[in-house]
UniProtKB/Swiss-Prot annotation:
It is found in: Cytoplasm. The lineage of its organism: Bacteria, Pseudomonadati, Pseudomonadota, Betaproteobacteria, Burkholderiales. It comes from Albidiferax ferrireducens (strain ATCC BAA-621 / DSM 15236 / T118). Its EC number is 3.6.4.-. This is Holliday junction branch migration complex subunit RuvB. It comes from the Bacteria.
Length: 358
């Protein structure tokens, strides 16, 4: 079994509480901490149970697993699951991303080199170009592709047979997938944010692999501030380890974890400066909302896509922000978190002020 990886095109953000990998070095550390079997995978119980059945059935029949679509916020384990699926099937994994596949020939080169029942993992699959997506359809349905040979009047199309394979597509934006592409996935799984208890198990496992002494309370303190995201939990664990080595005795205790996370500006709810800036902007500059995403982005100096994909989902999931047809609204929990008295409208009157368009 082999794993091959193409470099991803999009530069990742460097925010410590981002669910995206911060650097190639971090990706290497993540690979070392990544579970290799479903039995080692923590969380996503329903998805794990489904995959155990589907993978076992595919192995019993000696056929390719149905194509899999994994979607959800960044850092929840989509890439990890793709590696686990390939490992459980005992096949090779070829990994790439949507932006890398610029031309049909780029995808054709990958597909024609796959062996029987191999797994092709495409991250950011919603960013595939339409021309590349077109040649993917017959590959997914019939294991065939049409490619053009030559140019101009002499050009001709030839049909190539492919080995049966499994495509695993991952995306943070399932709504941006075209209907024809979405309909070709036989297995669709949404990954949810993790509970603090699940993240505490991940922190314990990672601390063991990193050989970092960590007591139960110290590990849980990291877990509960990790925004429900394993990648963030592992990142914070490494930063707290640094603090423990320099400012402590090398062991992560509750006190060490608390002091390190305060230094990193991560509060008990798992919010950082950017989260608080967003909530403060909605409350102080836009009277609590509703306010459009473009106005928020301009106000806090952040990209609209980063707010939508990285910052906003956790705030909404935790009940600090509401997304409405007229814009974003700060909830009573947001006012309380910032120590601000909510206006009378929030307490019982009309919550929705003048509309600010998206």
């Amino acid at each position: 079994m082999s794993i091959q990886t193409d470099d991803f095109a999009a530069p990742p953000p460097k925010r410590i509480l981002s669910g995206a990998p911060a650097s190639p070095n971090e990706e290497a550390v993540e690979r070392a901490l990544r579970p290799k079997l479903l039995d080692e995978y923590v969380g996503q119980a329903k998805v794990r149970e489904q995959l155990e059945i589907f993978i076992s059935a595919a192995r019993m029949r000696d056929e390719a697993l149905d194509h899999v679509l994994l979607f959800g916020p960044p850092g929840l384990g989509k890439t990890t699951l793709s590696h686990i699926i390939a490992h459980e099937l005992g096949v090779n994994l070829r990994q790439t991303s949507g932006p890398v596949l610029e031309k049909p020939k780029d995808l054709a080169a990958l597909l024609t080199n796959l062996e029987k029942n191999d797994v092709l993992f495409i991250d950011e699959i919603h960013r595939l170009s339409p021309v590349v997506e077109e040649i993917l359809y017959p590959a997914l349905e019939d294991y065939k592709i049409d490619i053009m040979i030559g140019e101009g009047p002499a050009a001709r199309s030839i049909k190539l047979d492919l080995q049966p394979f499994t495509l695993i597509g991952a995306t943070t934006r399932a709504g941006m997938l075209t209907n024809p592409l979405r309909d070709r996935f036989g297995i669709v799984a949404r990954l949810e944010f993790y509970s603090p208890e699940e993240l505490a198990s991940i922190v314990r496992r990672s601390a063991g692999l990193l050989k970092v002494p960590t007591d139960e309370k110290g590990g849980f303190e990291i877990a509960r501030r990790s925004r429900g995201t394993p990648r963030i939990a592992n990142r914070l664990l490494r930063r707290v380890r640094d603090y423990a080595d320099v400012k402590g005795a090398g062991e992560i205790t509750l006190d060490i974890a608390h002091r390190a996370l305060v230094m990193l500006d991560v509060d008990p709810q798992g919010f950082d400066l950017m989260d608080r800036k967003l909530l403060e902007a909605v409350i102080h500059r836009f009277d609590g909302g509703p306010v459009g995403l473009d106005n928020i982005a301009a106000s806090i100096g952040e990209e609209r896509e980063t707010i939508e994909d990285v910052i906003e989902p956790y705030l909404i999931q935790q009940g600090y922000l509401q997304r409405t047809p007229r814009g974003r609204i700060a909830t009573l929990a947001a006012y309380k978190h910032l120590g601000v008295t909510p206006p009378a409208a929030q307490s019982g009157g009309d919550m929705f002020g003048a509309m600010r368009p998206e």
